[in-house]
């Protein structure tokens, strides 16, 4: 019953202070939502946040590593008041239960660390980000993953500026493996992320107008 379902949201922002607190229950969710999982990656982190802020009907899942990145990059999750934030506070990642009840039509994991991608490929779900990815897959929820390690040599943003990184072969192989997962679209750039999100929005608008 509804009393056994986990709470819909926990507050979090870049300083650990309360940000938004959801009071609605699963039964109150009339319209399926976007889910967005933040991991511990700083790769185009600010750009990913900009895209995230433009989405309607949004829930944001913040892993413990993501909360650290938010502080390091001096970012704040300034989002519309109706956005719900979930903090990684329990070993079982209780908020993922919402996927069973049709609360989400789309999951976006962006940006995704090589560690997150590796765990997703291996079927390991031991934090909030990997848990929501696993549950989205089990519930056939289409998922977009913005992978960080996609080329042998890359420029990425560190807290103090751009740096050069050289992803390992295993990192590149895991990104390729993830592309074969059901209901999963892997993107490799901010431009591709924007295009994938826009395509999803257009599909949803078409589906809503025909229903």
Regions found by a protein language model. Give the residues of each.
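N-terminal amphipathic/basic-hydrophobic helices that include classical n-h-c signal peptides
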Residues: 1-24, 210-211
